[in-house]
């Protein structure tokens, strides 16, 4: 296991859930269910309300692989929209192009999806894009660059991930033509997040 995998392993142990949605981290949690530095049935330290909010914020940050600045800006954008700020926050993060590439099974992880986008493999509405943080809207369409080796890679990824995750109801995927279409912005019940987004809203609201 390399250094990056070890770091991710410590994160899932700290949070107690597999935020990366990959089987290898389920195995780590099963083998070592306690946070790093704790052994057996050692008593957990009492966590303050701020501490709880910070943990939930970190879960979302590491789940989507965004920086502190990106998450802060996403929260500010979510506040501008009508509706529940926490729901808006998750909806915006879900509609990042790297996340959609991941959700569709075109990549085995969000980190891998970011690489795919950054390398110019993705065509959005007929134009090549290289920015993983682009937010998609209803009717936006994703295709793969016309190159046999790239399409072979994506089809291999789809095959590897097909049994590991459920396809979201808010996107439409054509596995034969390697197309993705955004049907609509996801509602809260269409987002399988593993964090309490309301605590994240409270975290940022106190620092506004």
Swiss-Prot record:
<dbReference type="GO" id="GO:0006412">
    <property type="term" value="P:translation"/>
</dbReference>
<dbReference type="Pfam" id="PF00163">
    <property type="entry name" value="Ribosomal_S4"/>
</dbReference>
<feature type="domain" description="S4 RNA-binding">
    <location>
        <begin position="95"/>
        <end position="157"/>
    </location>
</feature>
<dbReference type="GO" id="GO:0042274">
    <property type="term" value="P:ribosomal small subunit biogenesis"/>
</dbReference>
<keyword id="KW-0687">Ribonucleoprotein</keyword>
<dbReference type="InterPro" id="IPR022801">
    <property type="entry name" value="Ribosomal_uS4"/>
</dbReference>
<dbReference type="InterPro" id="IPR036986">
    <property type="entry name" value="S4_RNA-bd_sf"/>
</dbReference>
<keyword id="KW-0689">Ribosomal protein</keyword>
<comment type="subunit">
    <text>Part of the 30S ribosomal subunit. Contacts protein S5. The interaction surface between S4 and S5 is involved in control of translational fidelity.</text>
</comment>
<comment type="similarity">
    <text>Belongs to the universal ribosomal protein uS4 family.</text>
</comment>
<protein>
    <recommendedName>
        <fullName>Small ribosomal subunit protein uS4</fullName>
    </recommendedName>
</protein>
<dbReference type="InterPro" id="IPR018079">
    <property type="entry name" value="Ribosomal_uS4_CS"/>
</dbReference>
<dbReference type="InterPro" id="IPR002942">
    <property type="entry name" value="S4_RNA-bd"/>
</dbReference>
<dbReference type="InterPro" id="IPR001912">
    <property type="entry name" value="Ribosomal_uS4_N"/>
</dbReference>
<comment type="function">
    <text>With S5 and S12 plays an important role in translational accuracy.</text>
</comment>
<keyword id="KW-0699">rRNA-binding</keyword>
<dbReference type="InterPro" id="IPR005709">
    <property type="entry name" value="Ribosomal_uS4_bac-type"/>
</dbReference>
<keyword id="KW-0694">RNA-binding</keyword>
<dbReference type="Pfam" id="PF01479">
    <property type="entry name" value="S4"/>
</dbReference>
<dbReference type="GO" id="GO:0015935">
    <property type="term" value="C:small ribosomal subunit"/>
</dbReference>
<comment type="function">
    <text>One of the primary rRNA binding proteins, it binds directly to 16S rRNA where it nucleates assembly of the body of the 30S subunit.</text>
</comment>
<dbReference type="GO" id="GO:0019843">
    <property type="term" value="F:rRNA binding"/>
</dbReference>
<dbReference type="GO" id="GO:0003735">
    <property type="term" value="F:structural constituent of ribosome"/>
</dbReference>
